[in-house]
C-alpha cells in the first residue's frame, strides 16, 4: 500500500512539473512570436494581442487540467480501492 501511495506522489509531482514546464515554454514562445509579429507589422498589434490572450488562456487551461487530475490522484486515489 505504501508503494502505491509513493508512486502516486511521484506521478503527481511529475505531472505538475511537466505541466508547469510546458506552460512556461509555451508562454515564452508565444510572447516572442507576438513581439516579433508586432514589430514586423505594428498596425496589426491589437488584433494579434487579442489572439495572444486567447492562446494564453488555453495554455493556462492545460496546466489547470493537469493540476485537477493530480489532485484527483492525491485525494481520491482509484488505485487504493483495488488493493482491498
Curated annotation (Swiss-Prot):
Residues of the site described as Reversibly protonated during proton transport: 60
Assembly, per entry: F-type ATPases have 2 components, F(1) - the catalytic core - and F(0) - the membrane proton channel. F(1) has five subunits: alpha(3), beta(3), gamma(1), delta(1), epsilon(1). F(0) has three main subunits: a(1), b(2) and c(10-14). The alpha and beta chains form an alternating ring which encloses part of the gamma chain. F(1) is attached to F(0) by a central stalk formed by the gamma and epsilon chains, while a peripheral stalk is formed by the delta and b chains.
Subcellular location as annotated: Cell inner membrane
Organism: Shewanella sp. (strain W3-18-1)
GO molecular function, one term: lipid binding
Domain of life assignment: Bacteria
Transmembrane segments: 10-30, 53-73
CDD domains (alphabetical): ATP-synt_Fo_c_ATPE
Alphabetical list of SUPFAM superfamilies matching this protein: F1F0 ATP synthase subunit C
Major place of residence: membrane
The entry's keywords: ATP synthesis, Cell inner membrane, Cell membrane, CF(0), Hydrogen ion transport, Ion transport, Lipid-binding, Membrane, Transmembrane, Transmembrane helix, Transport
Topology relative to the membrane: Multi-pass membrane protein
UniProt xrefs under HAMAP family: ATP_synth_c_bact
Role of this protein: F(1)F(0) ATP synthase produces ATP from ADP in the presence of a proton or sodium gradient. F-type ATPases consist of two structural domains, F(1) containing the extramembraneous catalytic core and F(0) containing the membrane proton channel, linked together by a central stalk and a peripheral stalk. During catalysis, ATP synthesis in the catalytic domain of F(1) is coupled via a rotary mechanism of the central stalk subunits to proton translocation. Key component of the F(0) channel; it plays a direct role in translocation across the membrane. A homomeric c-ring of between 10-14 subunits forms the central stalk rotor element with the F(1) delta and epsilon subunits.
Family indicated by similarity: Belongs to the ATPase C chain family.
InterPro entries linked to this entry: ATP_synth_csu_bac/chlpt, ATP_synth_F0_csu, ATP_synth_F0_csu_DDCD_BS, ATP_synth_F0_csu_sf, ATPase_proteolipid_c-like_dom, F/V-ATP_Csub_sf
Listed GO CC annotations: plasma membrane; proton-transporting ATP synthase complex; proton-transporting two-sector ATPase complex, proton-transporting domain
Protein name: ATP synthase subunit c
Amino acid at each position: 500500500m505504501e508503494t502505491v501511495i509513493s508512486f502516486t506522489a511521484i506521478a503527481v509531482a511529475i505531472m505538475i512539473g511537466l505541466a508547469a514546464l510546458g506552460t512556461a515554454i509555451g508562454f515564452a514562445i508565444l510572447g516572442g512570436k507576438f513581439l516579433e509579429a508586432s514589430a514586423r507589422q505594428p498596425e496589426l498589434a491589437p488584433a494579434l494581442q487579442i489572439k495572444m490572450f486567447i492562446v494564453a488562456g488555453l495554455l493556462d487551461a492545460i496546466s489547470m487540467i493537469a493540476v485537477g487530475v493530480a489532485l484527483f490522484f492525491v485525494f481520491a486515489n482509484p488505485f487504493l480501492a483495488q488493493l482491498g
